[in-house]
């Protein structure tokens, strides 16, 4: 059986916030602030949903993504060091 291809951090993060419906604030490179929940993403864009409306945001326009709540995607440092 072929070994799994490791996911990059960006895909892991976006998949985590999508599955858990974590509310996000996305800042664009031009300073615009968008808020919502990720419903879909690919290599080039993110689909953000808020109040029944969807926005397709191109990743090259994104500066920063800030979750609305603390998230824990990986084991804590002590747990990871022990493995």
UniProtKB/Swiss-Prot annotation:
Keywords for the protein's UniProt record, in alphabetical order: RNA-binding, Stress response
Entry GO terms, CC: cytosol
Start and end residues of each Sm domain: 11-71
Coiled-coil ranges from the UniProt annotation: none
Pfam families: Hfq
GO MF terms held by the record: RNA binding
Entry keyword annotation includes RNA-binding: yes
PROSITE patterns found in the cross-reference section: SM
Signal peptide bounds: none
SUPFAM superfamilies: Sm-like ribonucleoproteins
Record-linked InterPro entries: Hfq, LSM_dom_sf, Sm
Gene Ontology biological process terms in this record: regulation of DNA-templated transcription; regulation of RNA stability; regulation of translation, ncRNA-mediated
HAMAP family recorded: Hfq
Family listed: Belongs to the Hfq family.
Chain's role: RNA chaperone that binds small regulatory RNA (sRNAs) and mRNAs to facilitate mRNA translational regulation in response to envelope stress, environmental stress and changes in metabolite concentrations. Also binds with high specificity to tRNAs.
Record text on subunit structure and interactions: Homohexamer.
Protein name: RNA-binding protein Hfq
Species of the source: Methylocella silvestris (strain DSM 15510 / CIP 108128 / LMG 27833 / NCIMB 13906 / BL2)
Gene that produces this protein: hfq
